[in-house]
Design a protein with these regions (language model features):
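Short, ordered loop/turn segments at secondary-structure junctions
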Residues: 22, 53, 188-190
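Active-site loops and adjacent core secondary-structure elements that bind or stabilize anionic groups
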Residues: 10-11
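Single conserved hydrophobic/aromatic residue that forms the stacking wall/gate
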Residues: 1-7, 209-210
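N- or domain-start disorder-to-order transition segments that initiate the globular core
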Residues: 15-21
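Active-site pocket-lining segments that scaffold enzyme catalytic pockets across diverse folds
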Residues: 159-208
């Protein structure tokens, strides 16, 4: 396979390739530092090939005797790269699509920073109030009640950054221009008026630049 990819008898291993073991056991040995190192190397060289990895759950923690329940390595790498995940179909003559009148590929683009991959969450085992709190560096504090808990439940906090969303939007528009595809934006801004609404605002602003 290596020879076919390179197009010669020279093996990929001879091309100063760096390898990072993202197996669960090695991630546990390094406290997941190896995942960070792999992401930084990807930023340095501008290219990487990644094999499938395991994101541990409670059963995996016991099976591998892990120090903690490590986060998704994909999520860690994407957060460091601040990239966009493009899922494009492989179009091959002779293979008919499920929807036969689709003659052009549909590419899905997903923002790869923040949201659930960098969320903070915990289990609540007693009644009480949950708040969303922001403390500005200038001393200003904003505090909003999320929910009054009458009993046990779960809580999650997520975030995103304007700069990252702008980078995501630019990636989408540039990809669309390169591949001559239209851009269709989807969000739940009718419900998430601030969070998803901010995505919509940024895409709208940058779309005017690319028109």
């Amino acid at each position: 396979i290596a020879q076919c990819l390179v197009g010669s008898e020279m093996c990929i291993r001879d091309r100063n390739t760096e390898y990072y073991d993202l197996g669960l056991e090695h991630r546990n040995e390094t406290d997941d530092q190896v995942t960070i190192d792999a992401a930084e190397a990807t930023k340095k060289y501008g290219v990487a090939v990644k094999c499938a990895t395991i994101t541990p759950n409670a059963a995996r923690m016991e099976e591998y005797d892990l120090k903690k329940m490590y986060k998704s390595p994909n999520g860690t790498i994407r957060a460091i790269l601040d990239g966009t995940v493009f899922r494009a179909p492989i179009v091959v003559k002779g293979i008919e699509p499920c929807v036969k009148n689709w003659v052009k590929p549909i590419t899905l683009a997903r923002h790869a920073y923040g949201d659930i991959y960098k969320n903070t969450e915990f289990y609540i085992d007693k009644p009480g109030d949950a708040y969303l709190v922001f403390e500005g560096e200038d001393g200003e504090e904003r505090k909003e009640l999320i929910q009054h808990f009458d009993g046990a439940g779960v809580l999650r906090g997520m975030h995103n950054l304007d700069d990252s969303v702008k980078s995501f939007a630019r990636s989408c528009f540039n990809y669309a221009l390169d591949t001559k595809q239209d851009v269709w934006f989807g969000s739940k801004d009718t419900i998430s008026k601030t969070y998803d609404g901010r995505f919509k605002e940024i895409f709208q602003q940058l779309s005017l630049i690319h028109i």
